[in-house]
Regions:
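Bacterial N-terminal signal peptides
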Residues: 2-12
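Sec/Tat signal peptide C-region and signal peptidase I cleavage site
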Residues: 11-19
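Sequence/structural segment immediately N-terminal to covalent heme-attachment motifs in c-type
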Residues: 18-40, 123-148
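Gly/Gly-Pro-rich "capping" loops immediately C-terminal to redox-active cysteine motifs
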Residues: 23-25, 36-71, 146-177
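Short, structured interface segments
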Residues: 33, 97-120
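Axial heme c-ligation environment in periplasmic c-type cytochrome domains
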Residues: 46-62, 74-104, 122, 155-163, ...
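Short, solvent-exposed mixed-charge patches
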Residues: 212-213
Length: 213
């Protein structure tokens, strides 16, 4: 029993130390100047939203996959076709790069930032016809989001690209976001699908989106 307790103590201490190093690297890189890491969401008006320099990260650990975060921070590439909250400026992909160690440390720190609204949904990413029909026809998600079809990037420019969503997004977060996007982004053009789609349809759509390559 003592060995179990000691093992837990050392594991918890290591995890805490790792998170501490990640927070230090996060602060040293100046990430807090653009990214909110304490929830809940603060913007209340369009003016508030437009004042943001980058996406909030207070639920990063619920939204992203750690492997993606570490790789992206070391070699960042545009996720949004357009600059953050811009309809006219193309995203030039000028996000600062971190060293391999700092990227891993910051990714570990960000993965500890969880949103209680994101529950274990049990959803598995998968190609499914019902989800595809909702995405392509019923809601025309292509209008705002890019996807890759037969090796070609197609779709709208106003929202983040969903090409590569399978490597990037947690299906639990996708489901929570589709169900109640205002929790994460109070000022948003994204529809509240809880009043449009059934729970089963939201799950089908979340499984489909989180499987997009």
């Amino acid at each position: 029993m003592l060995m179990i307790a000691l093992s837990f103590f050392f594991f918890a201490s290591s995890a805490f130390a790792g998170a501490g190093e990640g927070k230090k690297a996060f602060d040293a890189a100046g990430c807090a100047a653009c990214h909110q890491i304490k929830g809940p969401a603060k913007e209340k008006t369009i003016k508030d939203a437009l004042a943001k320099k980058g996406p909030e990260l207070w639920y990063a650990g619920s939204k992203f996959k750690k492997e993606f975060l570490g790789g992206w921070l070391e070699d960042p590439r545009p996720i949004r076709p357009m600059e953050f909250y811009s309809l006219t400026k193309t995203n030039q992909g000028n996000h600062p790069k971190l060293s391999g160690k700092d990227a891993a440390d910051v990714a570990g720190f960000l993965m500890g930032l969880k949103a209680p609204e994101v529950k274990d949904s049990g959803i598995k990413p998968q190609e499914n016809q019902r989800g595809r029909i909702i995405f392509v026809k019923k809601q025309s998600c292509y209008g705002c989001h890019q996807v890759k079809e037969k090796g070609v990037i197609t779709g709208g420019l106003t929202g983040p690209s969903l090409a590569g969503a399978a490597e990037r997004l947690s299906p639990d977060w996708v489901c929570a976001y589709l169900s109640n996007p205002r929790v994460f982004k109070p000022v948003k053009d994204m529809p509240d699908y809880a009043g449009i789609l059934t729970d089963e349809e939201i799950r089908d759509l979340a499984a489909y989106v989180s499987n997009l390559n």
